[in-house]
């Protein structure tokens, strides 16, 4: 179940939102063993897969998964944005697999692939599963969520606490919840460049043009109260800078034709 409706004031998000607390967020990394000569060159070519895990804590901040009514998806820790993209039309490039209280995401955009996964938090295992199910229901409005081990989950739930505990003793975020999906994402276009954490301010600075508009174009029909939240929403979408770049290219084409 979602924990909040309009409580995304910390990130300045407009509109109704649904949020879920996370225990962990993991980002799949493929470390290149460049400069490793000798017999291990074949292993170096394959790379060393590992997971960079972020924990929810008082020091680093709480991990939160947010889905805005507009279809925007975010994962944040405090004021830091870890993931951000639009779920609209995501069936073509986004794959999601559920395993117990964890979700594994695989994306392939412009021949670049990456993966990340989340584990939901809760006072009990049942509460974490409930939050995961609530998030899956919201995600299902935009993209299919695969549950290949649903039969296994039912068997584990039918077991006693001791048997279930033994089968779930390992940290699910450190396991490979769906090796086939990981292989599919990695083989689709090789290991993509993984984004590091970034702030909304830094992203705004990276696409803000230094030129100042002439006086004739300085007016705007949008008020500051409306424009601010809208821009923050756009900047938190990791594909927005590429969109701005495409718009700039088209504008240059138009001005070139007119000149």
Swiss-Prot record:
Keywords: Chromosome, Differentiation, DNA recombination, Meiosis, Oogenesis, Spermatogenesis. Belongs to the REC114 family. It is found in: Chromosome. One of its GO terms (biological process) is spermatogenesis. It comes from Mus musculus (Mouse). GO terms for cellular component: chromosome. Changing residue 74 to A: Strongly reduced interaction with ANKRD31. It comes from the Eukaryota. Part of the MCD recombinosome complex, at least composed of IHO1, REC114 and MEI4. Forms a complex with MEI4; the interaction is required for MEI4 stability. Interacts (via C-terminal domain) with MEI4 (via N-terminal domain). Interacts with IHO1. Interacts with ANKRD31; the interaction is direct. Pfam families: REC114-like. Required for DNA double-strand breaks (DSBs) formation in unsynapsed regions during meiotic recombination. Probably acts by forming a complex with IHO1 and MEI4, which activates DSBs formation in unsynapsed regions, an essential step to ensure completion of synapsis. Required for spermatogenesis and oogenesis. Its main location: nucleus. Residues 203-254 are annotated as: Interaction with MEI4. Residues 150-160 have a biased composition (Polar residues). The gene is Rec114. This is Meiotic recombination protein REC114. Expressed in adult testis and embryonic ovary. Also expressed at low levels in liver. InterPro entries: REC114L. Residues 150-175 are annotated as: Disordered. Changing residue 104 to A: Strongly reduced interaction with ANKRD31.
């Amino acid at each position: 179940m979602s924990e909040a409706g309009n409580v995304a004031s910390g990130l300045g998000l407009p509109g109704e939102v649904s949020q879920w607390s996370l225990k962990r967020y993991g980002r799949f990394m493929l470390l290149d063993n460049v400069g490793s000569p000798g017999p291990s060159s074949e292993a170096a070519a394959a790379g060393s897969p590992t997971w960079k895990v972020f924990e929810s804590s008082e020091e680093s901040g709480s991990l939160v998964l947010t889905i805005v009514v507009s279809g925007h998806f975010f994962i944040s820790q405090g004021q830091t944005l870890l993931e951000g993209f639009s779920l609209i039309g995501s069936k073509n490039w986004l794959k999601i697999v559920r395993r117990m209280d964890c979700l594994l995401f695989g994306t392939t955009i412009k021949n670049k692939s990456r993966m990340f996964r989340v584990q939901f938090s809760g006072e009990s295992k049942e509460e974490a599963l409930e939050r995961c199910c609530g998030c899956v229901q919201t995600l299902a409005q935009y993209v299919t969520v695969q549950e290949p081990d649903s039969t296994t989950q039912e068997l584990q739930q039918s077991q006693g606490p001791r048997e279930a505990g033994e089968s779930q003793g390992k940290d699910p975020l450190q396991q490979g919840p769906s090796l086939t999906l990981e292989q599919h994402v990695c083989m689709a276009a090789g290991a993509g460049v993984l984004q590091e954490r970034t702030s909304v301010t830094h992203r705004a600075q990276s696409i803000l043009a230094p030129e100042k508009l002439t006086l004739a174009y300085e007016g705007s029909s949008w008020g500051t109260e409306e424009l601010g939240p809208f821009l923050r929403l756009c900047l938190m979408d990791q594909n927005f800078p590429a969109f701005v770049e495409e718009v700039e290219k088209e504008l240059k084409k138009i001005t070139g034709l007119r000149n």
